[in-house]
UniProtKB/Swiss-Prot annotation:
Cysteines engaged in disulfide bonds, as pairs: none
GO cellular component term of the entry, any: plasma membrane
GO molecular function terms noted in the UniProt entry: guanyl-nucleotide exchange factor activity
Lineage of the organism: Eukaryota, Metazoa, Chordata, Craniata, Vertebrata
Organism: Macaca fascicularis
Chain residue ranges for the region called Disordered: 1-35, 443-466
Pfam families found in the cross-reference section: RasGEF (PF00617), RasGEF_N (PF00618)
Gene that this sequence comes from: RASGEF1C
Composition bias type Polar residues, residue spans: 1-23
Protein's recorded name: Ras-GEF domain-containing family member 1C
GO biological process: Ras protein signal transduction
Boundaries of every N-terminal Ras-GEF domain copy: 34-164
Protein role: Guanine nucleotide exchange factor (GEF).
Domain Ras-GEF: 200-446
Keywords: Guanine-nucleotide releasing factor
InterPro entries assigned to the protein according to its UniProt record, in alphabetical order: Ras-like_GEF (IPR008937), Ras-like_Gua-exchang_fac_N (IPR000651), Ras_G-nucl-exch_fac_CS (IPR019804), Ras_GEF_dom_sf (IPR023578), RASGEF_cat_dom (IPR001895), RASGEF_cat_dom_sf (IPR036964)
Length: 466
């Protein structure tokens, strides 16, 4: 069924080589996790591990894990200020005379950290003050090597391009269409149906994949954390993340839209033979989505066909060859925490890792289940331990799940876009739930007293009839 985005429903770790600083806050050095990473540490120590020196650079996986999870405890702009301050302090960049040999070893590492940060979390740098901090710290090392200034210019140029692309977004990304309640089924001469736009299941599955990847591309990894953020008991600042998950929410709304679009297209035709043809068409589209690795569209199509206004059309379903549909339902069966789907997802992920073509790289997970997995990971483990240390072990697992998703969403779609099809998918009118029931009852009359009473109520509220 269509998904809602509420807290109740939404539900490559690397090694860490510590820099040459002493543990703080009385903590013991070396509380090892996998490959030497700490299972917990104070926030200050974790920040220190992020800061490069002339002889140290943090592991890439540590950088991603900490930048992803740190926003639960400290705002990104404040973290950047702390990192810049530590760099200036440790490398003595505020002195009138710099140790050029030391700075030349440190400079490339600092620029690499800033490049990784701006590349993976560009939204952390939307405020002018953060750009000013970048320019200030790089400006302090620039006298030692003029190429630093050039690299900084390239970094900022790439950042501005990323932010501009994120602001633009695909068609109808954030402001999802509100369902339209038809007063009655429009005449066939007026209503433009999907089969009139695209009658080939494989082509439609490809275009759905296009839409999915385009919308996925705009979801930042930080949105997974910000969707569930609670005020940290040791933090002094108020959480400010309620407006920072717009792309994640829009993607869940897209899933709902596709569910309702499928149901609308099925309930719209006047004749049961035509409705049966539409159902069989969507079964074939769903099968092609499965073969491609587009599990989100697959689940939306199955959910749309399982909506009550569609499933109650018994005379229509009697004309449908359902064997392929039952196979797909079995693959997405929620039994055993979606064990069949998870097996298929692992297979698609393995295929992606060993892919010889861009088509084989495609993995689009059932998104609401991914959100739910992350939600329960967040709810099941405390962010801090009783001693106040950050539970870094939890965030390694969080980063593993989010990092895998980031890899999948960066795949370039190998299918050529058909604007007429993708535009229809994003903008075609759809019934509301009440509109669907009314259309369903008009297609096949109510069978029991409950349905008759609902039909009468809908005719009164939507059509003004008694």
């Amino acid at each position: 069924m269509p998904q809602t985005l509420s807290a109740s429903d939404m539900v490559t770790p690397g090694s860490l080589s510590p820099p040459t600083t002493e543990p703080t806050d009385g903590e013991q050095a070396g509380q090892p996790l996998l490959d030497g990473a700490p299972s917990s540490a104070s926030l200050e120590t974790l920040i220190q591990h992020l800061v490069p020196t002339a002889d140290y650079y943090p592991e890439k996986a540590y950088i991603f894990t900490f930048l992803l999870s740190s926003r639960l405890f400290i705002e990104p702009r404040e973290l950047l200020a702390r990192v810049c301050h530590l760099c200036i302090e440790q490398q003595q960049l505020d002195k009138p005379v710099l140790d050029k040999a030391r700075v030349r070893k440190f400079g490339p590492k600092l620029l690499q950290l800033l490049a990784e940060w701006t590349e993976t979390f560009p939204r952390d740098f939307q405020e002018e003050s953060t750009i000013g901090q970048l320019k200030d710290v790089v400006g302090r090392i620039a006298p030692c090597d003029e190429t630093y200034r050039k690299r900084m210019h390239q970094l900022l140029q790439a950042l501005h391009q990323k932010l501009a692309a994120l602001r633009q977004g695909p068609e109808g990304l954030v402001s999802a269409d509100k369902p339209i309640s038809y007063r009655t089924k429009p005449p066939a001469s007026i209503h433009r149906e999907l089969l009139g736009v695209c009658s080939d299941p494989y082509t439609l599955a490809q275009q759905l994949t296009h839409v999915e990847l385009e919308r996925l591309r705009h979801i930042g990894p930080e949105e997974f954390v910000q969707a569930f953020v609670n005020k940290d008991p040791l933090a002094s600042t108020k959480p400010c993340f309620s407006d920072k998950t717009s792309h994640l929410e829009a993607y869940v709304k897209w899933f709902n839209r596709l569910c309702y679009l499928v149901a609308t297209e099925i309930c719209m035709p006047a004749k049961k033979k035509q409705r049966a043809q539409v159902i069989e068409f969507f079964i074939d589209v769903a099968r092609e989505c499965f073969n491609i690795g587009n599990f989100n569209s697959l689940m939306a199509i199955i959910s749309g066909m399982n909506m009550s206004p569609v499933s109650r059309l018994k005379k229509t379903w009697a004309k449908v060859k359902t064997a392929k549909f039952f196979i797909l339902e079995h693959q997405m069966d929620p039994t055993g925490n979606f064990c069949n789907y998870r097996t298929a997802l692992r297979g698609a992920a393995h295929r992606s890792l060993t892919a010889h073509s861009s088509r084989e790289k495609i993995v689009i997970p059932f998104f609401s289940l991914l959100i739910k997995d992350i939600y329960f990971l967040n709810e099941g483990c405390a962010n801090r331990l009783p001693n106040g240390h950050v539970n870094f072990e939890k965030f390694l697992e969080l980063a593993k799940q989010v990092g895998e998703f980031i890899t999948w969403k960066q795949v370039e779609c190998p299918f050529e876009q058909d604007p007429s099809i993708t535009h229809y998918l994003s903008t075609a009118p759809i019934f509301s739930e009440d509109g669907l029931y009314l259309a369903s009852y008009e297609s096949e009359s109510p069978e029991n007293q409950t349905e008759k009473e609902r039909w009468k109520s809908l005719r009164s509220s939507i059509l003004g009839k008694t």
